[in-house]
Design a protein with these regions (language model features):
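A small/polar (G/S/T-enriched), proline-flanked helix-loop surface module common
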Residues: 1-159, 164-176
């Protein structure tokens, strides 16, 4: 199966996606992608996007990459840390961003305050499902975490313009 070099409106590298797709099977498809590509939009309009989604499928496997902007203190860093310690979760760290693996999915949270001292978070999630997906497979979990990191860097830097987004390191998050 051929996975494009760029996915999600050509905004994310396809490498981690390739690691999640089977070698053979039905053709790769990108469906229902919105609010990932920034071309043709003003920076003010893009910064107001509160959520985005990209559905990818092929060979009986489906991926959902999504982000949302969390504000109002309903879900905080303390909640992220608590959920990362829950049974069945594995902590993730990408620089100052934190999150967790849960089943075959990855969740990363980037501090993205709109004012000094604000507690707003950017949540980026990757869900993996479909035929033959082993939720405990290290390669699946690692690729899902890598895709979440790619999406977190893109959304934090290019869409939400989060303070300190440039400090998010390249590469996959640390697992464990």
């Amino acid at each position: 199966m051929t996975v494009p070099a760029k996915v999600c409106e050509a905004s994310l590298p396809g490498g981690a996606v390739k690691g999640l797709m089977p070698e053979r099977g039905e053709e790769f498809q990108e469906k229902n992608a919105y609010n990932f590509a920034t071309g043709g939009h003003s920076s003010d309009a893009v910064r107001n996007w509160g959520l985005g989604q990209c559905l990818l499928a092929g060979g009986g496997v489906s991926l959902k990459v999504e982000y949302r902007f969390l504000q109002g203190g309903d879900y905080t860093r303390a909640d992220v840390e608590r959920d990362a310690r829950e049974s069945g979760s594995t902590p993730l760290t990408l620089g100052d961003a934190g999150g967790y693996l849960e089943g075959p999915g990855a969740h990363l949270f980037v501090d993205c305050p709109v004012r000094p001292g604000g507690d707003e978070l950017l949540e980026v999630s990757v869900g993996v499902g479909g035929n033959g997906v082993d939720v405990k497979d290290r390669a699946v979990r690692s690729s899902a975490a890598g895709l979440a990191a790619d999406a977190a860097r893109h959304v934090a830097r290019d869409i939400r313009s989060c303070p300190d987004a440039e400090k998010l390191p390249s590469g996959p998050p640390r697992i464990g």
